[in-house]
């Protein structure tokens, strides 16, 4: 069996702590640089962030049955726009530097792993990142625009106009983005639970119908609409994730 590197076994607790400190400082430095760059490029950053609020967004062009709609956004407090600018620059920088962060963290723990563990961990880290980013992209292109269009134009009475704040828009964007990113980690979670012996392929197949009901409920919560087409668009990717999870669980 392959053993961990000898140099790692000779390191003291304080050596490990110093190495971890170096990794954290590098991550913080890159995060700060990413934040400053994102903050300085305000116009392209918010052009990207606000694109789903425009009737010309790519999804609305694909699905012509949506028709035209217009949602005006407002800022209601003196500091709101500046604070939102900082917040979105911070979150954007976190997403951008994620590969480098994972690379540094893996470099820190890999010397303590056996060679076969190192290969397995590399695959898990890479696929976790790919799935998380896939969830983010799907949310930006499909899930969030559908939710925004429905909630932004929904009225209990024609006499009550919607006044959408920039803060509520960005909060929903962040929430759904994080939710979809985590949701797309389902295959990784299933693989891990399978390794622990908690679930297996037969278990997931047996409860497939129950899972479909749960998936429909989750999709309905994410996009609260009575439109069957929209519900299907949201449900299908999540269901495919479940089927993918079945295929990788032994």
What does each model-found stretch correspond to?
Residues 1-250:
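Membrane topogenic/interface segments and analogous intrinsically disordered interaction regions
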């Amino acid at each position: 069996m392959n053993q961990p590197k000898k140099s790692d076994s000779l390191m003291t607790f304080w050596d490990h702590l110093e190495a971890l400190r170096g990794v954290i400082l590098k991550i913080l430095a890159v995060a700060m640089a990413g934040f400053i760059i994102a903050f300085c490029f305000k116009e392209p950053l918010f052009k990207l962030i606000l694109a789903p609020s425009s009737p010309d967004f790519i999804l609305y062009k694909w699905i012509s049955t949506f028709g035209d709609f217009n949602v005006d956004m407002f800022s209601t407090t003196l500091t709101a726009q500046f604070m939102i600018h900082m917040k979105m620059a911070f979150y954007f920088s976190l997403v951008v530097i994620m590969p480098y962060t994972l690379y540094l963290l893996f470099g820190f723990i890999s010397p303590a792993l056996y060679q076969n563990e190192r290969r397995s961990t590399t695959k898990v880290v890479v696929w976790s990142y790919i799935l998380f980013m896939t969830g983010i992209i799907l949310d930006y292109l499909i899930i969030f625009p559908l939710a925004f269009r429905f909630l932004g134009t929904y009225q209990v009475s024609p006499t009550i106009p919607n006044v959408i704040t920039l803060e509520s828009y960005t909060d929903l964007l962040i929430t759904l983005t994080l939710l979809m990113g985590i949701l797309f980690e389902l295959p990784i979670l299933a693989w891990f639970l399978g390794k622990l012996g908690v679930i297996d392929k037969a278990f997931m197949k047996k409860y497939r119908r129950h899972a479909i009901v749960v998936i429909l409920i989750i999709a309905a919560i994410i996009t609260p609409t009575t439109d069957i087409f929209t519900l299907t668009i949201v449900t299908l990717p999540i269901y495919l994730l479940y089927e993918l999870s079945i295929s990788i669980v032994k």
